[in-house]
């Protein structure tokens, strides 16, 4: 009469932890195997995908030759007065807009560059 899987599981469930460890060692020896945990398969894209930024700061890095046009763009974007906008342009590099959406930041950068300034997104 053969012993069923059910009988083996019942016998193991009644064992102490130390008895189970001894059983595992005996099985490893008898069958020439190890009871090591198999490593999880590695996905093809092992590098974690960087989350896309949703908020950008628009930095005016250089005012360029046409400061008047740049000041007009800065005023339109920020709502600053003439004096404050001129100061922001004169003190380049300066942050023109913080936490802007990607679309808004790209539009501001484009407008600044069309006015002759150099800008970057961070």
From Swiss-Prot:
GO BP: any one term: translation
Keywords for the protein's UniProt record, in alphabetical order: Ribonucleoprotein, Ribosomal protein
Gene Ontology molecular function terms on file: mRNA binding; structural constituent of ribosome
Family annotation (SUPFAM superfamilies): ClpS-like, Ribosomal protein L7/12, oligomerisation (N-terminal) domain
CDD domains: Ribosomal_L7_L12
Gene Ontology cellular component annotations, sorted alphabetically: cytosolic large ribosomal subunit
Top-level taxonomic group: Bacteria
One Pfam assignment: Ribosomal_L12
Subunit structure, as described in the record: Homodimer. Part of the ribosomal stalk of the 50S ribosomal subunit. Forms a multimeric L10(L12)X complex, where L10 forms an elongated spine to which 2 to 4 L12 dimers bind in a sequential fashion. Binds GTP-bound translation factors.
Family: Belongs to the bacterial ribosomal protein bL12 family.
Function: Forms part of the ribosomal stalk which helps the ribosome interact with GTP-bound translation factors. Is thus essential for accurate translation.
Record-linked PANTHER family: 39S RIBOSOMAL PROTEIN L12, LARGE RIBOSOMAL SUBUNIT PROTEIN BL12M
NCBIfam families: L12
Name the record gives this protein: Large ribosomal subunit protein bL12
Organism of this sequence: Dichelobacter nodosus (strain VCS1703A)
Source taxonomy: Bacteria, Pseudomonadati, Pseudomonadota, Gammaproteobacteria, Cardiobacteriales
């Amino acid at each position: 009469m053969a012993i069923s899987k059910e009988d083996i599981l019942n016998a193991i469930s009644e064992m102490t932890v130390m008895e189970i460890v001894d059983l595992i060692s005996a099985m490893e020896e008898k069958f020439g195997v190890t009871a090591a945990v198999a490593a999880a398969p590695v996905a093809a894209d092992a590098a974690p995908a960087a989350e896309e930024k949703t908020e950008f700061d628009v930095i005016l890095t250089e005012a360029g030759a046409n400061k008047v046009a740049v000041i007009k763009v800065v005023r339109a974007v920020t709502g600053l007065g003439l004096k404050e906008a001129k100061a922001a342009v004169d003190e380049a590099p300066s942050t023109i807009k913080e936490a802007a959406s990607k679309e808004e930041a790209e539009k501001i950068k484009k407008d600044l560059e069309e006015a002759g300034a150099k800008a970057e997104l961070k």
